[in-house]
């Protein structure tokens, strides 16, 4: 049993390293990773868009990656619910269990959160073997593949976003952004019985994937007046809008488009300043909600896939071998217009 991993040592540079097999504590399981999804935040880290992450990479080397699934090969002495040979999905965020947020069940807002592949630990999933607390891994049934298991993490974001929004059966929605998170919001809306979902993006390949997954209509914002087009399609201003692109222009458009008493849910991470004009919504009694990761959702996500309610495989259009990690990240960063969702296969 040998462990190898890829360590980020600077902007756009991975270094392959031989690593020790992680220690398995009494409440941990040792997982042989089989698939890892390449998240948009991973690409930002790779590109040097996060100053603190780049500084840590250059100083000590860091390991990113948080969307993963694999097979348990060893268990700690206190572990009873997971056994060797079980395939599992890994919930990336671990709350402290002690702060006020954790005590309310809002552990995604924990004041001392440990998130896989993120500061302060930077111990991510880009390695063949990973030790992890057993309380935060979930057994996959036979009809959920390990590939799908790795995508439980982003699906959980979409499910959490729709839960927070309050959208439900018979409603209609607009989603800005058809990347992985936008598509999981789409899938979550459809699973809740939302009647009409319009998806907006600038990349045709992503829009076509949204159409395959069940979007009522797709709009290329570079080719049309989105506001007029949406109102024409839905027959009215939308009550629910999800901003899943992390794009300031899209966020501003949400304010202009939303209907009276509507709900705007901000799912994407806005990394750049946005000139939101609140005058656009001041007379509409609009509710703006924000989403940070997810909580208490993994079992629901796994069941939705197992029962055929949600299809995750369609969004994956690029699979790279783990040994191609450097190339995989370079291509995922450069080919955003073509790559909808990329994964590493170990």
Where are these regions (language model features)?
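Mid-domain Rossmann-like dinucleotide-binding core that forms the NAD(H)/NADP(H) cofactor-binding site
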Residues: 144-223, 228
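Glycine-rich cofactor phosphate-binding loops and adjacent beta1-alpha1 units
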Residues: 165, 208, 213-287
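Glycine-rich beta-strand-centered segment in the early N-terminal region that forms part
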Residues: 22-36, 51-100, 141-143
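C-terminal hydrophobic helical "lid"/dimerization subdomain
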Residues: 3, 248, 252-256, 295, ...
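NAD(P)H dinucleotide-binding glycine-rich loop of Rossmann-like/cofactor-binding domains
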Residues: 55, 66, 96-176
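Residues at the starts of beta-strands that form the adenosine-phosphate
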Residues: 4, 172, 195-196, 263, ...
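Residues in the short beta-alpha loop(s) of Rossmann-like NAD(P)-binding domains
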Residues: 203, 270, 294
């Amino acid at each position: 049993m040998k462990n190898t991993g890829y360590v980020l040592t600077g902007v756009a540079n991975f270094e392959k390293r031989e690593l020790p097999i992680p220690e398995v504590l009494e409440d941990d399981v040792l997982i042989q990773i089989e698939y890892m999804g390449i998240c948009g935040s991973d690409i930002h880290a790779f590109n040097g868009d996060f100053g603190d992450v780049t500084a840590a990479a250059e100083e000590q080397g860091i390991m990113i990656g948080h969307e993963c699934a694999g097979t348990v090969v060893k268990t700690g002495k206190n572990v009873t619910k997971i056994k060797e040979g079980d395939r599992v999905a890994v919930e990336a965020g671990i709350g402290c269990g002690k702060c006020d947020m954790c005590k309310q069940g809002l552990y995604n807002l924990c004041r001392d959160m440990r998130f896989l592949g993120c500061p302060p630990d930077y111990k991510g999933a880009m390695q063949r073997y990973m030790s992890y607390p057993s309380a935060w891994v979930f057994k996959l049934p036979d009809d959920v593949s390990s590939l799908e298991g790795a995508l439980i993490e982003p699906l959980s974001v979409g499910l959490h976003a729709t839960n927070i929004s309050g959208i439900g059966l018979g409603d209609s929605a607009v989603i800005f952004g058809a990347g992985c998170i936008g598509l999981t919001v789409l899938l979550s809306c459809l699973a809740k019985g939302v009647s009409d979902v319009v998806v907006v993006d600038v990349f045709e390949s992503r829009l076509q994937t949204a159409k395959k997954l069940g979007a009522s209509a797709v709009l290329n914002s570079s080719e049309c007046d989105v506001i007029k087009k949406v109102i024409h399609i839905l027959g009215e201003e939308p009550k629910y809008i999800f901003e899943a692109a992390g794009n300031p222009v899209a966020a501003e458009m949400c304010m202009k488009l939303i209907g009276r008493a509507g709900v705007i849910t901000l799912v994407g991470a806005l990394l750049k300043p946005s000139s939101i004009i609140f005058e656009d919504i001041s007379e509409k009694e609009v509710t703006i909600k924000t989403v940070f990761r997810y909580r208490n959702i993994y079992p629901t996500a796994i069941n939705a896939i197992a029962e055929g309610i949600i299809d995750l495989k369609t969004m994956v259009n690029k699979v790279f071998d783990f040994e191609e990690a450097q190339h995989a990240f370079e291509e995922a960063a450069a080919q955003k217009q073509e790559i909808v969702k990329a994964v590493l296969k170990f």
